[in-house]
Each structure stands twice: as structure tokens, then as C-alpha cells.
Amino acid sequence: MATKKVLVVGGAGGVGSAVVNLLVNRGCKVVTTVLEPEEAASIEERYGGMVQCHIVDLSNSDAALIKFKEIVSSMDQLNAVAVCAAIAPCGPLELTPLSTYRKAYEINCVSEVAIYQATMPALRQTGGRIVLLGSVGGRIAYTFMSAYIATKFALEGLCDVMRREAAPRGVKVSLVQPGGIRTNMVHQQLVDVRRDLAALDEKDRDLHGYLYEGYLRVAERGLGEGASTADQVAEVVLEALEAEEPESRYVAGEDAKHMLGSIGTMSDRDIDRLFNEMFLR
């Protein structure tokens, strides 16, 4: 494998953890970032000297930029970066606090710019690459997930600009677009939505309760019908890291392939009708 020294952003759980494991099994030297000290201790205990952990809070991208520059300067070389960290807040658009949108953009978009700026000098030296974890939610605007959807749509354009600006200097940039992923974070998300639904007052429940109920119904069904495991998505990330000439985008998961294929043949009106039927059922 050409990518011998890899930075994995968000290596504590889900796809990021699976990517770290695959890279270690291939003999790569991995540096990863996590949010909590306990997560770092757990990873370093599991992998020993094969994985080095750093605490980075992506909700403050200015501080994250400084930290990522420090991380890169401590490495003798950097062959690849895999960005797997994100948050996925849920809720009706009308009720979602503006602070939720700001935090989602900071973590899911602005921090990606910080990572790009911090790592590009080293990646130019090795002809390396960056792999970002997007979502089919960057192509399909899912009801009840406006903050997440907005950031993933933004990431699509951001990745295109990164790829076009990096390519002339020998750095490749790819985006992986998974559908549903069976992770602890997603299951906790369902718990949180049930809690938020139960906490609605009578007025908000009358106005918006169907959105919570529809989301729970759609998400629970989706997790059982074609959703991927974190390991399966990680394999696609690894494909993007290893390919001699990587694709600009990789669709990960049978559900993602089906959804993107279907949506591509539908009008906006048809898509609106489809989502309204799913949520009003």
C-alpha cells in the first residue's frame, strides 16, 4: 500500500474506528484524532505504537487548524488523510436552534477546510491524498435533518474545489457517499429523537409531531434494509486511499446506490411527494 503514514480524523468510533483498524492491519502508521482523553487512551492501549492519538475539538476550527499544523509538523511524512468525523443533528427546521446550524457547519465543513490547509504542504511533498466522508444526504435533502443536510450539500461543493485546486500539485481528493450506517451514534440518535418527541408541548406536537414519528419510522426501517456496517463503509474509504487513480466520488452501500439511482430519474415534485408520503404515512 502506497499510503504508509495516514492521518484519520475522528478515529474513536463508527467508520473512523474501522478505518484505523483496516490501516493498522495493513501495516500503516496511523495518527488519529478524537474528542475525549478516554477515547485516546483506549485506542493507544489497543494498538500500542501503531497508532498515535491527539485530542482535537472540531467545533473550534481556528484552534483545530493550529492543532493540525502541530500534528503534521511532528510527522516525518504524511501520505494520506481520511476525514471521518461529523455530527448529524435532527429535528424540524422550524424548531432547530440557529446555534445547531453553526455548530454543524463548524464541525462538518469549516473544520474540513482547516484540515486541508494544515495538511496540504505535507501532502504535496508525498503526492498524497485526502478522502472525505460525505453522505447521500449531500445529494438528497432528507426531511427532519436540515442542519446535517445543509453541511453535506456544502461539503460536496467544497470537495470539488479542493480536488481541482489540489490536483495540479499532485494531491488527489475523493468523497465517499454512504447511505445508512449501523453505528452506535445512529442508534443514539434514535434515542434522542424519541426523547425530544416526548418533551414537545401540545402545540409543537400537533404541528411537528408527525415529523419525529415519520423520521423514527423511516430511520428504523432503513437501518434494517440495506444499511451498511461501519466496516463496509471503511472498506470503501480504503479503496479511495489505495486506488492508483481514485474516483472523485465513491457511493458506499446498496441503499445509497439505490437511492441515488432512483432520485436521478425523478423531478423535484416527485421527490417532494415521495418524502411527504413517507413522513405522513
In which residue ranges do the predicted regions lie?
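C-terminal beta-strand-loop-alpha-helix "lid" module of Rossmann-like NAD(P)-dependent dehydrogenases
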Residues: 171-220
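Conserved NAD(P)H cofactor-binding loop of Rossmann-fold oxidoreductase domains
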Residues: 84-89
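Residue(s) in the substrate-gating loop at a strand-loop-helix junction
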Residues: 135
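Conserved glycine-rich cofactor-binding loop
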Residues: 12-13
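Active-site helix of classical SDR
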Residues: 116, 151-154
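Rossmann-fold cofactor-recognition segment
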Residues: 47-62
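Substrate-binding pocket helix/loop in short-chain dehydrogenase/reductase
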Residues: 92-93, 100-102
